A protein has these predicted regions:
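Catalytic histidine-centered segment of alpha/beta-hydrolase-like enzymes
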Residues: 293-302
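Hydrolase active-site cap/lid region
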Residues: 181-236
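Short amphipathic alpha-helix adjacent to the substrate-entry channel of hydrolases
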Residues: 106-125
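Gly/Ser-rich "nucleophile elbow"/oxyanion-hole loop immediately N-terminal to the catalytic nucleophile
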Residues: 151-166, 186
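Alpha/beta-hydrolase active-site loop
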Residues: 134-154
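Short beta-strand element of the alpha/beta-hydrolase
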Residues: 88-97
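Short beta-strand/loop motif that positions the catalytic acidic residue
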Residues: 259-261
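A glycine/proline-hinged amphipathic helix-loop "lid/cap" segment
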Residues: 1-82, 313-336
Length: 336
């Protein structure tokens, strides 16, 4: 039976890129510098690319911070809830970026508040534990505890614990899809949708774009290697399915996905490769490449966030999982 045209396009992209990808694995032989601190890494970027905390006074949102028990230490959750008209809200857990070693709830404020307001959802932004102080599996276990807290408190927030989505940027995209896998495997939480913005998915760094050809203004291969060394100090962890989604052979049963990649991002190939793997596993998947965007900028890009909002409105409206075989949508969007 011939492949559907949309599927063939996706597979062609993956095959072409794999031929020319450089091998960055030698970077794992480098030790972390003794003075290694997250603020040294390229995610700080240019001032123009920094995500500043949004003014939430006029967004019509009730925003509050909550402390819960995490895997290795207490963590903070930031709750964004739209003004209620009596409607029961869906739930979205959001995970900030920062390469597993930096980032904060404040960094995620623009994205989380936009999703809450425009989707009309109860959004919980998760302040998960950061490496190197708290390496894997602290972050995904924190994510799971945040999901458990959301389920336990949904009724009090007039939210529906049966309509949960997850989303994240960069390392947060990794945590979002890994949380979906953990929830599937443990069986006590059902996640209906996942939206991944420029996700950081491949600790092997064998699917990363050529740094000499993709002019990334905000992250580089050395920074990625340092982050993975800090987050996954044991080499065997770089194959764990809850740390390396692209290495997983058990993608069936994951929720429908939206994956947004940025043209000027070293990670766009692995993001699109993951989309192909999800499709092959029967997971309904939409892919959008933003051709004039960079890695950091995608987290608060209006076009990307509009796609996320539309995706969650569609996927969290129903109370049942979407049937297999949805059409893959591959788009390229100019942000200029």
């Amino acid at each position: 039976m011939p492949l559907r045209q949309e599927w063939a396009v996706s597979i062609a992209i993956v095959r072409c890129d794999r031929i020319v990808l450089p091998d960055y694995r030698h970077l794992f032989q480098m030790s972390l510098p003794p003075e290694f601190v997250p603020s040294q890494l390229g995610w700080d970027g240019a001032d123009a690319l920094k995500i500043t905390m949004a003014s939430t006074l006029d967004l019509g949102l009730c925003i509050e911070d909550v402390r819960i028990a995490g895997h290795a230490q207490p963590i903070t959750l930031r709750s964004y809830r739209p003004a209620s008209d009596g409607t029961v809200l869906p739930v979205v857990l959001y995970f900030h970026g920062g390469g597993f070693v930096r980032g904060s709830l404040d960094d995620a404020d623009v994205t989380a508040s936009t999703i809450a307001r425009d989707t009309a959802a109860w959004v919980i932004s998760v302040g998960y534990s950061l490496a190197p102080a708290f390496p894997f599996p602290a972050a995904p276990e924190d994510a799971y505890r945040a999901a458990q807290w959301a389920v336990a408190n949904a009724r009090a927030q007039r939210a529906d614990a049966n309509r949960i989505g997850v989303a994240g940027h960069d390392a947060g995209g990794n945590l979002a899809t890994c949380l979906a896998a953990i929830a599937r495997d443990r069986g006590d939480i059902v996640i209906l949708a996942q939206a991944l913005l420029a996700p950081l998915l491949d600790p092997s760094m064998t699917r990363m774009a050529d740094e000499n050809k993709v002019r990334s203004p905000d992250i580089g291969v050395t920074e990625c290697a340092q982050c993975y060394r800090a987050y996954l100090p044991n080499a065997s962890q770089r194959l764990h399915p809850y740390a390396a989604p692209l290495e997983s052979r058990r993608l069936a049963g994951l929720p429908p996905a939206l994956i947004a990649s940025a043209q000027h991002d070293l990670l766009h190939i692995e993001a699109e490769k993951y989309a192909g793997e999800l499709i092959a596993a029967g997971v309904p998947t939409e892919v959008t490449r933003h051709v004039n965007a960079s890695h950091n900028a995608l987290a608060a890009d209006p076009a990307a966030l509009a796609d996320v909002v539309a995706f969650f409105k569609k996927r969290l409206r129903a109370r049942t999982l979407a049937p297999l075989g949805d059409t893959l949508k591959i788009q390229t969007i100019s942000t200029t």
